[in-house]
Structure formats: structure tokens, C-alpha cells
Regions:
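Glycine- and acidic/polar-rich repeat regions and solenoidal domains
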Residues: 2-16, 23-257
Length: 258
């Protein structure tokens, strides 16, 4: 736990350059005066984070904007964004770096900020549980505000009933910064736990380059909301279930028999 301490006014640990691997460390309670404290502040180089826990930090991991930096997050847990503040604390916030891979990790109990937000050039979000859960009130569950290449495969992405924002996955809200803008969603389960209709995936076509590619394949949506009807692109094999068809609170994502 940080216990009010930080490195360089930024984080519990600051990774400035080089090739690093961090394993089996728990990062808690990171705060700094500007509201952007982090468990890890990753600035440049290559970093792999494996089997770590990030809890009650202003940001779990926060990166800088060096376009040659690469971040991999494997089998880690991000939870419990701080409350009692007007700041937007993201559990994982990735800046304009070369690449991001997040695999086998869990994100839950956000508050006003996002569970995972990335401005990276290339993104691979694979086989994770982004489930805001009871007591969570994150904004977006997953956002790529500046586009880029984003592969989102095999995740369970679940929005809390207490979320103030209907969008579950967002792409390109601030336009397309990168030369390649491509969103592929496949084999994901997207859940709305509230009674307000969700926007399961929103891509801002008017703000993105005309050659932007959006493809969805074999995704399952659960609960009220719009998916491909409000999403331009190529869509195949997606299926919708009504509210209550799954039991996210019990981590039961088996669909009913038909």
C-alpha cells in the first residue's frame, strides 16, 4: 500500500525506460495531488505486468505517450476506483503508445471513469472479464477514443445498472489519430444489467476516416440495447438474449438451452 507515499509525484512505481517484467505485486491506494496517481506509471520501453493486483488507485496503470512504448498485462486484477472525488479515475489508462495487450485479466468496481481506456496504436484485448459488478458505476467499460487497430476477442464485458453512460464499448469518440483504424469484435459477451437501453458498441463514423473498418462476428448481447443496428460495418453471427438470461453476479455466463 502506498500509505501516502509516491515516487516523483506520479505513482508507487515509475518505469522510465528499458525492458521490464513485474510479477506477483499488489499495488494499493496510490494518490498524488494532481489526481493522476497510479500503481504503476509506465513511461517508455517495454513492460509486462503479470499476476498483479491494482486496488483503490487513482489509476491502476497509467502510461505516458511515447509512441515506441509497448505494454502487456496478463492475468491481473484491477478494482475499486476511488470514490468521494470528482476526478475520473480509470482502472487502466493507456496513452498514445505503440501497442497494448491485455489478456486473462479482470476489471471491476469502477467509479465514473472507465474500466479500460486506451489510445494505443495497436490493441489486443483478449479473454478478459470486464464486469463492473455490484457497487460499480464506471462510465465506459472499454474505450478506444482515438481509434487505432483494436482486436477485442473472447471477453465478457458487463455494464453495471448504476452506470451513468449507456455505452459499453466506445471507438473513435475523439477521431482517428492513427493511420490504421480498425475495430474487430468477435466472440464477446456484452451485458447490460440496467433497464435503460445500452449502446453495446458505438463507433463515431463522422469523426473517423472514411476507410475505417468495423467488423463484428459471433458476439452475444444480453439485455436491452442496440448493437449492430446502430453500428456501420460488417456483421456476422451476432445474437441477442433478453435481460436476465445470464447471471453475471454469480459469474454464470452459460446461455440457456434453446
Amino acid at each position: 500500500a502506498a500509505n501516502g507515499q509516491n515516487a516523483q509525484g506520479k505513482a508507487i512505481w515509475v518505469i522510465q525506460n528499458g525492458n521490464f517484467q513485474i510479477e506477483n505485486i499488489e499495488f494499493r491506494d496510490a494518490t498524488v495531488s494532481d489526481g493522476n496517481g497510479a500503481g504503476i506509471r509506465f513511461e517508455q520501453g517495454q513492460l509486462e505486468v503479470r499476476d498483479c493486483i491494482f486496488e483503490n488507485n487513482q489509476n491502476g496503470i497509467l502510461t505516458a505517450n511515447f509512441e515506441d512504448a509497448e505494454l502487456r498485462v496478463l492475468n491481473s486484477v484491477f478494482s475499486q476506483a476511488p470514490r468521494g472525488t470528482t476526478a475520473l479515475h480509470h482502472l487502466l489508462y493507456v496513452g498514445r503508445i505503440k501497442s497494448l495487450v491485455v489478456e486473462g485479466s479482470r476489471f471491476h468496481q469502477g467509479y465514473q471513469g472507465h474500466l479500460l481506456k486506451s489510445r494505443a496504436r495497436r490493441n489486443e484485448i483478449r479473454y478478459n472479464l470486464l464486469l463492473d459488478g455490484q457497487g460499480g458505476s464506471a462510465s465506459y467499460e472499454l474505450e478506444f477514443p482515438e481509434g487505432g487497430a483494436a482486436l477485442v476477442v473472447g471477453n465478457v464485458i458487463s455494464q453495471s445498472a448504476d452506470s451513468a453512460n449507456p455505452i459499453v464499448v466506445g471507438y473513435g469518440a475523439e477521431g482517428g489519430r492513427w493511420p490504421e483504424n480498425r475495430l474487430l469484435l468477435a466472440h464477446n459477451t456484452l451485458i447490460n444489467n440496467g433497464w435503460r437501453p445500452a449502446w453495446f458498441t458505438r463507433a463515431w463514423a463522422s469523426r473517423l476516416p472514411p476507410d475505417t473498418i468495423v467488423v463484428t462476428r459471433n458476439n452475444l448481447t444480453v439485455g436491452l440495447g442496440l448493437f449492430t443496428l446502430a453500428l456501420s460495418g460488417e456483421h456476422h453471427g451476432n445474437f441477442a438474449l433478453p435481460s436476465g438470461a445470464l447471471n453475471p453476479a454469480a459469474l454464470d455466463f452459460n446461455p440457456p438451452a434453446f
